[in-house]
């Protein structure tokens, strides 16, 4: 992506989008584990506080599946059962609970957080121009969501130090692919400077 692309430098024009920071992706015995995902919890919690102080919306996505698995689609053939409604695996990680002012996109049934959810509507109602994206998994749900966001004309920043993949190698490969046309890859500090979120 062109590094000269201009991001709208009004703090409230950028949303922090936190993808799927849930127990079933983060805990040591998670059915769909990430490499380093649990270590992101305090990092993203601090980032979320920074975004709120700047007046930016903080949006969490929460993957969810029905107990009968009828909404798993073809995932049921190659992924273990995860994020089942009513279970603890669906819960957002301890230490990262959304604040009352935050938004939660629930019942995300697919990798892409826009598909079948109100995410785009919520962003447009808040007049969001930029997305700063954190969470897991870089090579799956983060990637799918960012690509859709770009096609909807959102400017995307994927946060290098606030994302994790199903492996370190896949995380790095996903970032390489995304920066070709879909997102700027930035650290938290450099992204905050770009969008005007102020000091750490």
Name the predicted role of every residue range.
Residues 142-152:
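Short Gly/Thr/Asp-enriched flexible loops that form oxyanion-binding sites at enzyme active sites
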Residues 75-79, 150-151, 173-177:
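Short, hinge-like loop/turn segments at secondary-structure boundaries
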Residues 53-56, 127, 153:
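Glycine-centered short loops/turns at secondary-structure junctions
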Residues 1-103, 194-200:
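Active-site acidic carboxylates
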Residues 132-135, 153-168:
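A short glycine-rich beta-strand->turn/loop micro-motif centered on a GG-aromatic cluster
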């Amino acid at each position: 992506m062109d590094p000269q692309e201009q991001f709208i430098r009004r703090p409230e024009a950028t949303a922090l989008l936190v993808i799927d920071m849930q127990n079933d992706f983060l805990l040591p015995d998670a059915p769909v584990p990430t490499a380093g995902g649990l270590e992101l919890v305090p990092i993203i919690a601090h980032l979320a506080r920074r975004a709120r102080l700047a007046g930016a919306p903080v949006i969490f996505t929460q993957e969810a599946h029905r107990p009968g698995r009828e909404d798993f689609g073809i995932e049921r053939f190659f992924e273990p059962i995860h994020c089942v409604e009513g279970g603890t695996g669906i819960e957002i990680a301890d230490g990262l609970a959304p604040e009352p002012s935050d938004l939660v996109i629930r019942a995300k049934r697919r990798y892409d957080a826009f598909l079948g959810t109100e995410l785009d509507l919520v962003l447009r109602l808040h007049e969001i121009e930029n997305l700063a994206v954190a969470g897991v998994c870089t090579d799956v749900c983060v990637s799918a969501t960012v690509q859709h966001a770009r096609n909807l004309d959102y400017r995307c920043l994927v946060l290098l130090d606030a994302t994790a993949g199903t492996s370190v190698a896949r995380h790095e490969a996903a970032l390489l692919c995304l920066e070709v046309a879909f997102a700027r890859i930035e650290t938290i500090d450099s992204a905050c400077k770009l969008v005007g979120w102020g000091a750490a």
